[in-house]
């Protein structure tokens, strides 16, 4: 599919973004391990989350929906999970594969999990290694670093593990495995990463404690199903936020967006660039902080994005590079080498596609350097099969001088079904 973006004067009005992808995955996982019904609204019916749904259905869990944005999981406890009759397919979802590995490691049956061609190239050794330390038998290509991966699970031993890099997925996989261990599991982070797993484990009744940079989960009593309204995904909101900042007549309010402090690095970085952004009506939904975000057109300036800020905005770096292209001065992004092993090499893809549109941008081994301001020219872009690259190119095209074409844009459905329609409904021609 091809997406055509024409220049816009701005974005105006109120909008809601789809439910948070990270939380939607975890609702299905914990709802499947819990006893009783879990009913979630504002669930993201994107391709990645649907892969998680399919995996748990294959393990014998009764899941109704998603019907629109509502899903019901009728959990019967972890002992009700059964060996899948076929290979589990995580599709393009690294979250599905890595977190599922943690759960499968604790099950008394054999599983094989794989994914599409892109996911089969992404490294899994950071997860499989510590799970093997906990007692799981795991086999796969290149010493269990590449899928397909086979797991012979069973009773695990709790461990104390220091993450070699900041990774919410690795932390989450080990905490989920810790539910099935014979003693507590402690995970220590080099810097804070998104904490949705800890919050949701506690909400479902698990015994979770945080002390400094460490999180501990105990072999848990029975998890209990619950009702949850999933907040809007700030990673999806980021595309509208940057689009409003760089188009000249914008005044946009995004409603009910998750503002978990481990995810709001995008707001901090843009504030450092001079963005006119305000957050109002703070509240809680399902144990997660939620608020409305108002964004107005702004004159941006260059900044440095590095260190502990990176895990708090890692998914937003492609669209931050778009903001930087329109900012006055130099923006330096570093400590982001992890982006090279996402759905695409996001550093290379961002540099290539923004260069195509006329940006002054270059790669470094662990980041990007962008000089602005530049009025981008429009042109023909490749999504690289990566939803975040496709949407970043679309945002860049809104403020360009001519039409922008994004090829292979169907990948956007991974995280934001209906993105183009939502964008068009807000634009000033």
Swiss-Prot record:
Q: What class of enzyme is it?
A: transferase
Instruction: Give binding positions for 3-phosphoshikimate.
Output: 21-22, 26, 167, 169, 315, 342
Q: Which Pfam families match?
A: EPSP_synthase
Which residues of the sequence carry a binding annotation for phosphoenolpyruvate? 21, 94, 122, 169, 346, 388
| Keywords in alphabetical order | Amino-acid biosynthesis, Aromatic amino acid biosynthesis, Cytoplasm, Transferase
InterPro entries recorded: Enolpyruvate_Tfrase_dom (IPR001986), Enolpyruvate_Tfrase_sf (IPR036968), EPSP_synthase (IPR006264), EPSP_synthase_CS (IPR023193), RNA3'P_cycl/enolpyr_Trfase_a/b (IPR013792)
A GO cellular-component term linked to this record: cytoplasm
Q: What is its main location?
A: cytoplasm
Pathway of this protein? Metabolic intermediate biosynthesis; chorismate biosynthesis; chorismate from D-erythrose 4-phosphate and phosphoenolpyruvate: step 6/7
Annotated GO biological process: amino acid biosynthetic process; aromatic amino acid family biosynthetic process; chorismate biosynthetic process
Q: What does this protein do?
A: Catalyzes the transfer of the enolpyruvyl moiety of phosphoenolpyruvate (PEP) to the 5-hydroxyl of shikimate-3-phosphate (S3P) to produce enolpyruvyl shikimate-3-phosphate and inorganic phosphate.
Q: What is the protein name for this chain?
A: 3-phosphoshikimate 1-carboxyvinyltransferase
Q: What is the lineage of its organism?
A: Bacteria, Bacillati, Bacillota, Clostridia, Thermoanaerobacterales
User: Its encoding gene is what?
Assistant: aroA
């Amino acid at each position: 599919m091809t997406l055509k973006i024409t220049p816009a004067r701005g974005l105006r009005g109120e909008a809601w973004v789809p439910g948070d992808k990270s939380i939607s995955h975890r609702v299905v996982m914990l709802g499947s391990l819990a006893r009783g019904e879990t009913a979630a609204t504002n669930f993201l019916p994107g391709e990645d989350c649907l892969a998680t749904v399919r995996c748990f259905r294959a393990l014998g869990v009764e899941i109704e929906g998603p019907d629109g944005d509502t899903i019901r999981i009728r959990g019967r406890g972890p002992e009700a999970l059964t060996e899948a009759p076929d290979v589990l397919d995580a599709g393009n979802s690294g979250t599905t594969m890595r977190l599922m590995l943690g759960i499968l490691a604790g099950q008394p049956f054999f599983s094989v999990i794989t994914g599409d061609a892109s996911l089969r190239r992404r490294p899994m050794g950071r997860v499989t290694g510590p799970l093997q330390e906990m007692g799981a038998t795991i086999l796969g290509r290149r010493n269990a670093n590449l899928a397909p991966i086979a797991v012979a699970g069973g009773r695990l031993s709790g461990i104390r593990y220091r993450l070699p890099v900041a990774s919410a997925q690795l932390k989450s996989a080990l905490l989920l495995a810790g539910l099935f261990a014979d003693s507590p599991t402690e995970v220590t982070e080099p810097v804070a990463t998104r904490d949705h797993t800890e919050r949701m484990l506690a909400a479902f009744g698990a015994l979770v404690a945080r002390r400094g940079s460490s999180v501990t989960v105990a072999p848990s009593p029975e998890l209990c199903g619950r009702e949850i309204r999933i907040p809007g995904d700030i990673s999806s909101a980021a595309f509208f936020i940057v689009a409003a900042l760089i188009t000249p007549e914008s005044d946009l309010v995004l409603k009910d967006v998750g503002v978990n402090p481990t995810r709001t690095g995008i707001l901090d970085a843009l504030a450092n660039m001079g963005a006119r952004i305000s957050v109002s009506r703070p509240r809680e939904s399902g144990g997660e902080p939620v608020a409305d975000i108002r964004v107005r057109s702004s004159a941006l300036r260059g900044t440095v994005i590095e260190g502990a800020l990176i895990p708090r905005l890692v998914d937003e770096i492609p669209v931050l590079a778009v903001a930087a292209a329109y900012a006055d001065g130099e923006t330096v992004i570093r400590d982001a080498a992890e982006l090279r092993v996402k759905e695409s090499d996001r550093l290379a893809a961002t540099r290539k596609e923004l260069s195509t549109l006329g940006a002054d941008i270059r790669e470094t081994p662990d980041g990007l350097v962008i000089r602005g301001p530049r009025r981008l020219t429009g042109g023909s872009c490749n999504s690289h099969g990566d939803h975040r690259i496709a949407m970043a190119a679309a945002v860049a095209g809104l403020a360009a001088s001519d039409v922008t074409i994004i090829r292979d844009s169907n990948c956007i459905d991974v995280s934001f079904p209906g993105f183009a329609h939502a964008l068009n409904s807000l634009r000033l021609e």
